[in-house]
Amino acid sequence: PREVVRLVLALKVNSLARGYSGVRWTVIETLLACLERDVLPAIPGQGSVGASGDLAPLAHLAAALIGVGDAVAGGRRLPATEALNAAGIALLELRAKEGLALLNGTQVSTALALRGLVGAEDVLAASLVAGALTIEAALGSITPFDARIHAVRGHASQSDVAAAVLRLIEGSEINESHRDCGRVQDPYSLRCIPQVLGACLRTLRDAAAILVDEANAVSDNPLVFPAGDGAGDVISGGNFHAEPVALVADALAVAIAEIGNISERRCALLVDPTFSQLPAFLATDPGLESGYMIAQVTAAALASENKGLAHPASVDSIPTSAGQEDHVSMATHGARRLDDMLRNAANIVAVELLSAARGIAFRRPLRTSAALEAVLAEIAPDGGGTGDRYLSPEIERVAALVRAGRFTPLVAQLFPTTAR
């Protein structure tokens, strides 16, 4: 994707500009010109094992700069020479070390992981909003979100999630209407939102710290350490090994799977009248209509698919280069699959958002909080509709809002990259 390639170029500039890669300024200036004029090398997403850097994908970047292969400019894929010439960018004539400096590095896997991190923040934010709506629709208790419970466990992210849910529900007539009910303990998918999504939030925060380190890293090899007067050392090491990115990508994958898992369980809870005290499957005429039955089945299918996709990529090392590269990270594959997982998770959360909106419609004329009413007005202005209907376009529309970060501002203070 265009935004990933732009990030790859920016990360490569940042690494080379540190001054340890033995390249001329003209190499960096050419990369910057490509960014400024939006001439982007055509880089494949596959072909890297995440050690010796992202060699194959970055080879396509380097090739374009010398006029080999293709580039994308103005939305069109062109021969690289044609694209560069049209933009007034001179072809690079590489000198010693410069080709290797362009090929070596973790920029592709890091760019993909950063994209996955931002996407995970958006899905987690939407999941918190969906969870708050489900609490309202199912007449769930907010007692388990009491700050004292979370303070004694000592996990800041857990406390932060609990506080965020309380803020979302604050001022709700629905919540006030059952304050003195006899319900003692809700199912874990409601009661343990702070514990589950708080742990996911901690994973995202930790991932951000590691990826920021990697974004500012010199992951070339060998490295050049000048000592002045033209002297210095050229040292071969292993900074190209993307294990930090691989482990982060795997952690993000597990977190994304868990966000989808708990959201799907709340979808199941909403269509079950035994707990929700709502019509079966949220149907206007239960028994005659299916309501949200198949929407929940879809959410279950996507949650299970994500469980398979969450298998750690980093444990699947495979030797390459006649055994010289005998341990590799698989970081690029691990980071690339995050997009598929995020798409699935966004669809699951969209099903929950729509299901909860339908449930709240049955609680009218009581209103939820001002913040959640604004969400309802956007996702389901008709209250989730009546009768059986074609739900796919609605799910896709709300999932697109999730992926676009529409709900993230409601809980933006939680996330490490909210300055984006």
What are these regions (language model features)?
Residues P1-I43, L117, I135:
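Glycine-rich, flexible loop motifs
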Residues R2-L16, P44-I66, R95-S109, A295:
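FAD-binding core of FAD-dependent oxidoreductases
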Residues Y20, V49-A51, G287:
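Conserved, non-catalytic sequence blocks in retroelement Pol enzymes and Pol-derived host proteins
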Residues E29-E36, A56-A63, A125:
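A broadly conserved amphipathic alpha-helix scaffold signal in soluble, globular proteins
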Residues R37-D38, A64-R420:
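C-terminal auxiliary extensions adjacent to catalytic cores
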